[in-house]
From Swiss-Prot:
Active site feature: 12
Disulfides per UniProt: none
Family note: Belongs to the arthropod phospholipase D family. Class II subfamily.
Entry protein name: Dermonecrotic toxin LgSicTox-alphaI-Loxn-A
Enzyme class label: lyase
Function: Catalyzes the hydrolysis of sphingomyelin. May also act on other phosphatidyl esters. Dermonecrotic toxins cleave the phosphodiester linkage between the phosphate and headgroup of certain phospholipids (sphingolipid and lysolipid substrates), forming an alcohol (often choline) and a cyclic phosphate. This toxin acts on sphingomyelin (SM). It may also act on ceramide phosphoethanolamine (CPE), lysophosphatidylcholine (LPC) and lysophosphatidylethanolamine (LPE), but not on lysophosphatidylserine (LPS), and lysophosphatidylglycerol (LPG). It acts by transphosphatidylation, releasing exclusively cyclic phosphate products as second products.
GO biological process terms, semicolon-separated: killing of cells of another organism; lipid catabolic process
Tissues in which the protein is found: Expressed by the venom gland.
Cellular component terms (Gene Ontology): extracellular region
The record's free-text note on cofactor binding: Binds 1 Mg(2+) ion per subunit.
Keywords: Cytolysis, Dermonecrotic toxin, Disulfide bond, Hemolysis, Lipid degradation, Lipid metabolism, Lyase, Magnesium, Metal-binding, Secreted, Toxin
Amino acid sequence: ADNRRPIWVMGHMVNSLAQIDEFVNLGANSIETDVSFDRNCQVLVVFDLKTGHRWQFGGITNKVLNEAAYK
C-alpha cells in the first residue's frame, strides 16, 4: 500500500485575484484567504484580524471563485 501523503504548497494570506494567479504560477497547489459573504453569496471582504487590514472584493461572485479554483 502507498502510505505517502501529499505535500501542500500553500499561498498564505492571499488578498486579491492577482495574488491567487501569482501564487499558482509560483507552484502553490492550495490558497489560504479569508472571505465573507452577503445573503446573495457575493464576496464582501477579506479581513486580517492581526493587522486590521480590510480589502474589498466588490463584484466577485462564487462563480468567479470557483472558476479560479479550476484553472
